[in-house]
From Swiss-Prot:
It catalyses: (6R)-5,10-methylene-5,6,7,8-tetrahydrofolate + NADP(+) = (6R)-5,10-methenyltetrahydrofolate + NADPH; (6R)-5,10-methenyltetrahydrofolate + H2O = (6R)-10-formyltetrahydrofolate + H(+). This is Bifunctional protein FolD. The lineage of its organism: Bacteria, Pseudomonadati, Aquificota, Aquificia, Aquificales. Belongs to the tetrahydrofolate dehydrogenase/cyclohydrolase family. GO terms for molecular function: methenyltetrahydrofolate cyclohydrolase activity; methylenetetrahydrofolate dehydrogenase (NADP+) activity.
Length: 285
């Protein structure tokens, strides 16, 4: 069984990013700049944002955080995004999700300049991904998963891929990446899928992203499958995934741990996207 170590690969990617930024700044170019917007005081979101700010600093990306009150209006938030869209010194914009219930999340995402959309959530970037365009900014978690598979020489050509979870953040874009260039046969499962086990047992590559601890058990995975666990759940004070890791690993060819698998890759690809957006602007100068 191969343990897909996202933590070590993420460090490798971050080191490469740091080296590239160091080379650019030594030539007189400014640092890349990422604006991070957090609305409210959700403890988990605060942890994620602070981690992103810390990781930005570690590679030489300048972060420009905005910590906004829970009761900010839709109009006020849109005005801030408009200002950041027009700021030539800002390369990337990230709005930490989830947003408070009174904020229209889709409208906020659509307000971000698609060329500054480091999360890859804007409909233009999603459309580019869906149509196979190579200039799409890719969502960080699915992109990180593809990088992880590539690092371990796991090819998905001709494979049966099953994605459990149909969110806009992971499930849907993940499916589109596997479909790109007609490489894989992809099945998406969701809350209305009948007999989930019958689908997961067919998977050469199984990606699970639903937020239900140990949803996927050993009897739901075929021998020799590659299992990617995106879930992050807190159970009895411990972080666990959506897969029953200890039992499923007995059957898997390769599997991601939780923590230390997909999570670090998501942050690494956020930094990667920020650098790529910055470099695109340099080419235009």
């Amino acid at each position: 069984m191969i343990l897909l170590d996202g933590k070590s690969l993420a460090e490798k990617i971050k080191n490469q990013i740091k080296q590239e930024i160091d080379q650019l700044t030594q030539k007189g170019y400014r640092q890349p700049v990422l604006s991070v917007i957090l609305v409210g005081e959700n403890p988990a979101s605060q942890i994620y944002v602070n981690k992103k700010i810390k990781d930005c600093a570690s590679v030489g990306i300048k972060s420009k955080p905005f910590f906004l009150p829970e009761n900010i209006t839709q109009t006020e938030l849109l005005e801030l995004i408009g200002d950041l869209n027009g700021d030539e010194e800002v390369d990337g914009i990230l709005v930490q999700l989830p947003l408070p219930s009174h904020i229209n999340t889709l409208e906020i995402i659509e307000a971000i300049n698609p060329y500054k959309d480091v999360d890859g959530f804007h409909p233009i970037n999603v459309g580019k991904l869906a149509t196979g365009r190579n200039d799409a900014i890719l969502p960080c978690t699915p992109y990180g998963i593809m990088k992880l598979l590539h690092e371990y020489n796991i090819d998905h050509f001709g494979k049966d891929v099953v994605v459990v979870g149909a969110s806009n953040i992971v499930g849907k874009p993940m499916s589109l990446l596997f479909l790109k260039d007609e490489k894989s046969t992809v099945t998406i499962c969701h809350k209305n899928t009948k007999d989930l086990k019958s689908h997961t047992l067919k998977a050469d590559i199984l990606v699970v992203a639903v937020g239900k601890p140990k949803l996927i058990t050993e009897d739901m995975v075929k021998e020799g499958a590659v299992v990617i666990d995106v879930g992050i759940n807190r159970v009895d004070g411990k972080i666990v995934g959506d897969v029953d890791f200890e039992n499923v690993k007995k059957k898997a060819y390769a599997i991601t741990p939780v923590p230390g698998g997909v999570g670090p890759m998501t942050v690494a690809m956020l930094l990667y996207n920020t650098l790529e957006i910055y470099k695109r602007k340099l080419i235009e100068i």
